[in-house]
Amino acid sequence: MKEFDTICAIATPIGEGGVSIIRISGENVLKIASKIFTPRNKYDIESMKTYTMKYGNIVDLENKKEIIDEVILSYMKAPRSYTGENVVEINCHGGVISTNSVLDQVIKAGARLAEPGEFTKRAFLNGRIDLSQAEAVMDIITAKTELSMKAAMIQSKGALSKEINELRGYLLNVLALIEYAVDFTEDDEDIVDDNLILQIKDGIENTNSKIETLLSNADAGKIVRDGLNIVIVGKPNVGKSSLLNALLRENRAIVTDVPGTTRDIIEEYINLDGIPVKITDTAGIRDTEDVVEKIGVEKSKEKIEEADLIILMLDASRYIDEEDSRIINKIKNRKYIVLLNKMDLKDIKIQEEILKNLSNIINISAKTGQGIDILKDEVKKLFFNGEISSESLIISNARHKQALYKSLENCKMALDKINANEYLDLISIYITAAMKALGEITGDELEEDLLNKIFSEFCVGK
């Protein structure tokens, strides 16, 4: 365990509540606590046993008679704590004043206010967790759905770490074979045994296959972690706001028969079978002289560029006109779903021949709810092949994805060099680079500046 000073921070959200927790971590936690904590039974805090709790008061450091708050103090002895250090947690009354008053006394008694993510950083530096597990902690905190929570929990338990360590083991074995082959050629001045080259190639190809398997769900993983950005577009009065209300199951957007009612962007979040989805209802796209509506139309066009998925709504009770065609041309090279709305009406006029060049067409009625479930299933098909597993490892972190691609690229370069009969010393450079890239995921190979940046994005107290 590394030696650090003693740090403290509020570990619970600031605000009114039943209980707040002040976390203290470091060698001197009991010594600091004994200066400001008075147990009801006159117990010697510095001899407190691990995994026990004591009831008492936090008192003013300079005036022991002044009670700051009534608290419960718990102790976890190193190394069996979150940080791997001695940890004390003070459970005080929730509330801004009471919590900050207790924290002030802890600081006066000798602790330093922790930096963002410093507790988790210490857990990493003390070997309690690796970097991928540390990042999973933040993902758990920010999870938007049960699925994203489960994905983060699987990673926090070391599932990704296990895969990465296995891959590094394969590549380490490849390096050992290369070193043996190099020594063999130096000693015997002979051509390397073909079987040895075959073993080296097999080791690299096996690694490539496993990396590609991990990367196969990376795009879906990003959506599980960060959410899917869906933008609803179409002409005015085709039913975009009605669709938003149907998906939200509440009247969030104003719905009228007057074209151009929605002049600004409306953004809402829904849980689509575990997928966090941000749905944006845009202003109807059309040529207009209205200054305010024109701004809304420009915003709509900007949102189209940012979307993961575009939902184009067409009014099935009208003929497709030039404005519809312009919108169709704008989205046809993107991932999209076309909704033919108002299919509950008897007079359907939309021209089928114009739709022949479009795919993913669904008949719906935003008013009655017809086709809404089909729409949800189609979204899942487009991004998850219709199935989302909550039990398997999902690569959801962009940094992990980038490192895996870097490792894969170096492995492929190594194979190319082998097939070109290049020197084995040159091939070992690519294998070493591939191992280094994998080590960036677990933190075994990472610059301190990048480590500091990763942990700085955590909240204070975690």
Curated annotation (Swiss-Prot):
Residues binding Mg(2+), per UniProt: 241, 262
Cofactor note: Binds 1 potassium ion per subunit.
Entry's localization field: Cytoplasm
GO biological processes: tRNA methylation; tRNA wobble uridine modification
Binding-site residues, GTP: 237-242, 256-262, 281-284
EC numbers for this chain: 3.6.-.-
Keyword Nucleotide-binding recorded: yes
Residues in TrmE-type G domain copies: 227-384
One term of GO molecular function: metal ion binding
Binding-site residues, K(+): 237, 256, 258, 261
Top EC group: hydrolase
Major localization class: cytoplasm
Residues binding (6S)-5-formyl-5,6,7,8-tetrahydrofolate: 23, 89, 128, 462
Keyword list, A-Z: Cytoplasm, GTP-binding, Hydrolase, Magnesium, Metal-binding, Nucleotide-binding, Potassium, tRNA processing
GO cellular component assignments: cytosol
Named cofactor requirement(s): K(+)
Subunit structure: Homodimer. Heterotetramer of two MnmE and two MnmG subunits.
Similarity field: Belongs to the TRAFAC class TrmE-Era-EngA-EngB-Septin-like GTPase superfamily. TrmE GTPase family.
Record's function text: Exhibits a very high intrinsic GTPase hydrolysis rate. Involved in the addition of a carboxymethylaminomethyl (cmnm) group at the wobble position (U34) of certain tRNAs, forming tRNA-cmnm(5)s(2)U34.
Designated name of the protein: tRNA modification GTPase MnmE
Source organism of the structure: Clostridium beijerinckii (strain ATCC 51743 / NCIMB 8052) (Clostridium acetobutylicum)
Organismal lineage: Bacteria, Bacillati, Bacillota, Clostridia, Eubacteriales
Name of the coding gene: mnmE
